[in-house]
Swiss-Prot record:
It holds the Pfam family Ribosomal_L28. The keyword Ribosomal protein applies. Belongs to the bacterial ribosomal protein bL28 family. HAMAP family: Ribosomal_bL28 (MF_00373). One of its GO terms (molecular function) is structural constituent of ribosome. This is Large ribosomal subunit protein bL28. Disulfide bonds: none annotated. It comes from Prochlorococcus marinus (strain MIT 9313).
Amino acid sequence: MSRVCQLTGTRANNGMAVSHSHIRTKKLQQANLQQRRLWWAEGNRWLKLRVSTRALKTIQKKGLGVYAKSLGIDLNKI
């Protein structure tokens, strides 16, 4: 399973690690992904999703159905 948020598509970011002597080396900044079982009220069922913590905060605020609809995602296909 790839490290990608199933709702937002958030993935790893390429960055640089800078030492005290300013030597720069490439590093990969992974997304903070969590495996969660979320209740989808409109579908009256549980969905097991791998989502970022930022997406989890938005789901708590708006609700899973509204948030997925705003992203253009059909939850019936998951």
